[in-house]
């Protein structure tokens, strides 16, 4: 299978997964020669600055889009029009109109489109999903999802205009898949004095409440940390994970708390990034059914955009007040 990987930023994470497989032929597109050389030296992939040449080449099976967010929908549609399968990094689009266009084009095509909602394949998420579906601990009453990170990528910031879309979309997808769309949403935000920001969002449901929080105000040695706490009528599942300041060396654990006591629960499986790309390639080989369709992410994208707009209205009001 031949893959065109578009983008040298987050595309590096995808490149590492492809390189570990050894059964795909990857060509990386980028505009910065130094970054392309780094990817070529690290993974041995062919690189190019000729984007039109990629789209004109009928030998590519899959276009993997890791370009800036504003370009995602445009390139997904272009790839489909060229008869190629698509893997698109989050978010699918910056508005629901463009997202629906991709979903409609995907439904009308014999090519497959995958939105890289990798968290759906996280072993800890799958364990939680099964607990909710099977009512292992009764009814889910409170769901708390957290993600905290240092700014680990040179030149990249997570201010109020990007943090929800770039950092919390996956957490909000988890929320929607477990509890559905909320009745009400309340947000709060703070912006770092130089870089970063933090967001808290509270959601209400008829019989549950939820909180999603993200912070990009952490010092570099903090790395990335987060997880969930799910409180049921008859128990609690608590998941924590950490990764070092390179974003690597992840460690994750899930604990169960019930009236019988406390124990660590095994959440088996690959890391979510690897599992998601493995799923994409399995689908293209006819071995699995697409769980990452554009239609499947529309509700979570709508909620993400709603929170994004609420946070930025609040941030704008705070800035005006400060002046």
What is each PLM-predicted segment?
Residues 93-152:
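A contiguous active-site-proximal alpha/beta segment in oxidoreductase catalytic domains
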Residues 14, 43-103:
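Beta-loop-alpha module in the N-terminal Rossmann-like domain of NAD(P)-dependent dehydrogenases
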Residues 172-245, 276-282, 322-323:
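Contiguous beta-strand/loop segments that form the cofactor/metal-binding neighborhood of enzyme cores
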């Amino acid at each position: 299978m031949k893959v065109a990987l578009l983008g040298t930023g987050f595309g590096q994470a995808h490149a590492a997964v492809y390189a570990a497989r050894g059964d795909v032929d990857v060509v990386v597109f980028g505009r910065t020669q130094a970054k392309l050389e780094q990817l070529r030296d690290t993974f041995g992939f062919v690189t190019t600055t000729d984007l039109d040449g990629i789209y004109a080449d009928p030998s590519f099976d899959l276009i993997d889009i890791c370009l800036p967010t504003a370009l995602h929908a445009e390139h997904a549609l272009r790839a489909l029009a060229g008869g190629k399968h698509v893997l698109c990094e989050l978010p699918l689009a910056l508005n629901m109109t463009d997202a629906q266009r991709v979903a409609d084009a995907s439904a009308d095509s014999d090519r497959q489109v995958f939105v890289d909602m990798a968290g759906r394949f996280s072993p800890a998420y799958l364990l939680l999903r099964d607990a909710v579906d099977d009512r292992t601990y009764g009814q889910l009453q409170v769901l708390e999802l957290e993600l905290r990170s240092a700014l680990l990528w040179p030149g990249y910031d997570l201010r109020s205009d990007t943090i929800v879309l770039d950092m919390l979309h996956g957490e909000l997808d988890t929320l929607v898949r477990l509890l559905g769309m909320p009745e009400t949403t309340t947000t709060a935000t703070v912006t770092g004095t130089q870089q970063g920001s933090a967001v808290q969002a509270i959601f209400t449901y008829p019989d549950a409440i939820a909180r999603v929080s993200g912070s990009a105000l952490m010092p570099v040695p903090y790395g990335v940390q987060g997880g969930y706490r799910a409180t049921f009528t008859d128990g609690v599942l608590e998941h924590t994970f950490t990764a070092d300041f390179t974003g690597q060396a992840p460690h994750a654990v899930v604990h169960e708390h019930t009236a019988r006591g406390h124990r660590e629960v095994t959440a088996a499986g690959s890391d979510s990034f690897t599992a998601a790309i493995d799923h994409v390639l399995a689908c293209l080989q006819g071995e699995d059914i697409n769980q990452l369709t554009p239609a499947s992410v529309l509700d979570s994208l709508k909620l993400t955009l709603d929170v994004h707009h609420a946070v930025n209205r609040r941030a704008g009001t705070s800035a005006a007040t400060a002046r």
